[in-house]
Amino acid sequence: MADREGGCAAGRGRELEPELEPGPGPGSALEPGEEFEIVDRSQLPGPGDLRSATRPRAAEGWSAPILTLARRATGNLSASCGSALRAAAGLGGGDSGDGTARAASKCQMMEERANLMHMMKLSIKVLLQSALSLGRSLDADHAPLQQFFVVMEHCLKHGLKVKKSFIGQNKSFFGPLELVEKLCPEASDIATSVRNLPELKTAVGRGRAWLYLALMQKKLADYLKVLIDNKHLLSEFYEPEALMMEEEGMVIVGLLVGLNVLDANLCLKGEDLDSQVGVIDFSLYLKDVQDLDGGKEHERITDVLDQKNYVEELNRHLSCTVGDLQTKIDGLEKTNSKLQEELSAATDRICSLQEEQQQLREQNELIRERSEKSVEITKQDTKVELETYKQTRQGLDEMYSDVWKQLKEEKKVRLELEKELELQIGMKTEMEIAMKLLEKDTHEKQDTLVALRQQLEEVKAINLQMFHKAQNAESSLQQKNEAITSFEGKTNQVMSSMKQMEERLQHSERARQGAEERSHKLQQELGGRIGALQLQLSQLHEQCSSLEKELKSEKEQRQALQRELQHEKDTSSLLRMELQQVEGLKKELRELQDEKAELQKICEEQEQALQEMGLHLSQSKLKMEDIKEVNQALKGHAWLKDDEATHCRQCEKEFSISRRKHHCRNCGHIFCNTCSSNELALPSYPKPVRVCDSCHTLLLQRCSSTAS
C-alpha cells in the first residue's frame, strides 16, 4: 500500500484501491470457500469483541472474491469520508471541526488496522500453502515470502511517528526493533550482525535484514510479543491508534507463530534491502470471476455451514457462561446473607462499645480528680527529692572522679595487656619460626649424629688404648713394688748383718783388748773388709734414693693416669647423656618421619583422587562437548535436500549421472564421492557412516585429544 497523506476522500479511495500486477504468480487462486474481507467503519468490532472473535474467525473462510469486496470497500470508504467531510464543513470551524477531524482519522486508522490484519492472514495462509507444496523450505526468491515481508513492513509502519532531525524527517521501523535487544538478550546477535553488515546504508534496510534473520531463527513471533507486552516503550515510536499499540498486534503475533514450521534460507548478501517500500501484489490472492461463478453455490453452502457451526459454538459458549454466572450469583447471594448477619452483629457491637465509652468517660473524670490531688502531693515530694538529689550529686561527682581515675588506671593496664598480647603474638611467630628451625635442626642433628658416632668410635679406640696403657702401668707398678719389697728385704738383711757386724766389732773390741796382738794382726784385714762393706752400704743408699725417686715419679704418673681416667669417665658420662638426648631426638625424628610418611600417603592419595577426578572431569567435559555437538548437529545443521544442491560443497564440481550426490551424516551437507569417502562411528549412529573430509579430520582430532 502507498503511504497516506490525509486529505480528500478521493485520495483515500485511490490509496485503498489495490494495484494489480500483470501475470499470475504461483498460488494465484484461492481455494473455493475463501475470501479476503475489507471491513467498513460501521462493521468494526469493539476492542472487547476482538478477543472472542479471533477464535471462530480462524476457522472461517473467505466467501467472496477479493476484487469485488475491495471495490465495495473503496466505495463505502469514499462515501463515509465524504459524509464526514460534509458534516465537518456544515458544523464550521473551531473545536467542532477539530473533533470531527479526529474522529475521521480514528475511523481511518481502525479501517487500516482491520485491512492490514486481514491482509496478513491472507499472506501467511498463502505462504504456508506454498511452503507445504514445496517441502517447507523457502529462499529469498519465493514470491509469497517476499509479499509476506512487504505486508509485515506495512504493519510495522502503521501509525509510526515521524522523527525530525537536522538532516530531515525520518520514519523507519528499525527504531522499535532495536528495543528487542534490551528486552530480550537472545536478540543481541541479530542486532550486532545487522549493524555489522557493510552493504546496508539506511535504517529501512537494517529493519528488513532484522526481519529476515528473526524469521530464519524462528523467533519472529516471540520478539514481537516481547515488544507488544512493553507498550509503554512503544509509545515513543507509535501513535496511540497504531496497529502495534492495539489488539490487532497480538492477533498478528498469534498468526506469526504458525511460521515457525517453515525453514527459510535467506541470503542477505547481494540483496537490495535499502530500496523503497514494495507494493502488495494482490494477484497472489485473487481468482477470476469466471472461475468463481461455478462455485457460488458451494460457497453459499460452506458459508451456511460455517455460520451454523459458529452459532452452535456461540450457543455452547453462552450456555457455559450462563452456568458460570448462575454459580457466581448463588455465591454472591450466600456472601450477601453472610454480610447481613455480620452487619447486624456489628451494630450490636457498636451499641455495646458506646455504653463502654460512657463508663470510660465517668472513670476518666474520677481519675482526673485523683490525678490533680496526686500532682500536689508529688510537687511536695519533688522538692524534697531535689534537695536529696543535690546532696547525692555531690557524692556522685566524687564517685565520678574516683571512677575516672580507675578508668585511667584500667586504660594503662589495658595498654600493658595489649603490649603483652603483641609480645605473645611475637612469641607465637617466633615459635612458628622455631618450629621451622627445629625441622632444620633435625636435619643438622642427623648430620651431627653421624659425626658423634664417628667421635664415639674414636673415643672408644682412645679408651681402649688408655686402658691398655693403664694395665701396662699397673703391671710395671706391681713389678716395681715387688722390686722395692725385695730391696727392702735386702736392706733389712744388710741392717741385720750390720748389727751382727757391730756386735762382732764389740766382741772384737773386747777381744782386742784381750788380744791386741791378734787384733793388730787381723786389723789390717778387717779394715779392708770394713771399707768394702762401707762402699757397699753407700751404693745401697744410692740405689734406695734412686728407687724412691722412681717411686715418686711412678706415683705422679699414676695420679696423672687416674686424673685422665676420671676425665675420660666424665667425658664418657657426658657422651652417654648426649647419646640419651640423641636417642630421644631419634624417637622424635622417627615420630616426625612417621607423621611425614602418613602425610605423604594422604597427599599421594589426595593427588591420586584429584587425578582421577580430573580424568573423570575431562571425560565428562568431552562427553558434554560430544553431546553439544550432536545437539548442534541436530539443531543447527539443516539436512539439505537433493534438489537444493547442484555442486559439491568442497570441490564445487557439478553433479551429474557419473558424479553422484552423497550426504555427510555429521553436518548434513551434500558432497561428491571423492570428498565424502571416509567413514566414522558417530554418537547418533551405531555403525560407521559416511563423513566429509573436513568432519573426518575434526572428529579424528577430537578422538586423539580424548585418547591423550
Swiss-Prot record:
Key word Protein transport present: yes
Phosphoserine PTM positions: S620
Gene Ontology cellular component annotations, sorted alphabetically: cytoplasm; cytosol; early endosome membrane; endosome; intracellular membrane-bounded organelle; nuclear speck
PROSITE patterns listed in its UniProt record: RUN, ZF_FYVE
Entry keyword set: Coiled coil, Endocytosis, Endosome, Lipid-binding, Membrane, Metal-binding, Phosphoprotein, Protein transport, Transport, Zinc, Zinc-finger
A Pfam cross-reference name: RUN
Example GO molecular function: lipid binding
Modifications the protein undergoes after translation, according to the UniProt entry: Phosphorylation on Tyr-389 and/or Tyr-400 is required for interaction with BMX and endosomal targeting.
Expression by tissue: Broadly expressed, with highest levels in lung, testis, kidney and brain.
Binding site for Zn(2+) 2: C664, C667, C692, C695
Region Interaction with RAB4, annotated ranges: 615-625
Effect annotated for changing Y389F: Abolishes phosphorylation and endosomal targeting
Region span, Disordered: 1-57, 493-522
Gene3D superfamilies: 1.20.5.170, 1.20.58.900, Zinc/RING finger domain, C3HC4 (zinc finger)
InterPro entries (UniProt xref): FYVE_RUFY1, RUFY1-3, Run_dom, Run_dom_sf, RUN_RUFY1, Znf_FYVE, Znf_FYVE-rel, Znf_FYVE_PHD
Residues involved in Zn(2+) 1 binding: C648, C651, C672, C675
Modified residues (Phosphotyrosine): Y389, Y400
Compartmental location: Early endosome membrane
Biased composition (Basic and acidic residues): 1-17, 500-522
Disulphide connectivity of cysteines: none
Self-association state and partner proteins as the record states: Self-assembles through coiled coil domains to drive ELVA (endo-lysosomal vesicular assembly) formation. Interacts with BMX. May interact with SSB. Interacts with RAB4 and RAB5 that have been activated by GTP-binding. Interacts WITH RAB14 and RAB4B (GTP-bound form); the interactions allow endosomal tethering and fusion. Interacts with ARL8B (GTP-bound form); the interaction is required for RUFY1 endosomal location and promotes interaction with RAB14.
Name under which the protein is recorded: RUN and FYVE domain-containing protein 1
